[in-house]
Amino acid sequence: MPEFNDEIWKRSIHTLFRPMIEFHFPDLYPLIDWSREPAFLEEELANLFDPKKVGKRFVDILAQVFLLDGTEKYILLHVEVQGYGSGEEDTLEFEERMFEYYYRVRDKWKVKDIAALAILTDGNEKYRPDRYETSFFGTTLTYVFNVS
């Protein structure tokens, strides 16, 4: 397997951000004010996590965009590179991590509207988890995210 290169993925996503949003979020795309450049907040996002826990097999992009009505929104792109999808433990870890990104961004920037997309590169078409669920004595939480 070729060596994973975080910077290549980040540059690719930055360069292709607009067509990626058009493809993955066709309803959101025309609402974005593209005359204003998206602000990429990877460094701020990385600071929300313990560096020892951040792996080298995924890339996280947090972009702040403005809609045509002037409101600010956030788009979280998570690229999962190879190796996942082999078992139930991987799935639960991945789903929980997606939820953790969501609630930390929501808490840090005090925002409700976050569009999240997980891009999986593992090649296993049957492994496409799209939600994190937990329940304890009648209290239930379900977080659903986009996956490609």
Model feature map: region roles:
Residues M1-S148:
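Accessory alpha/beta interaction modules
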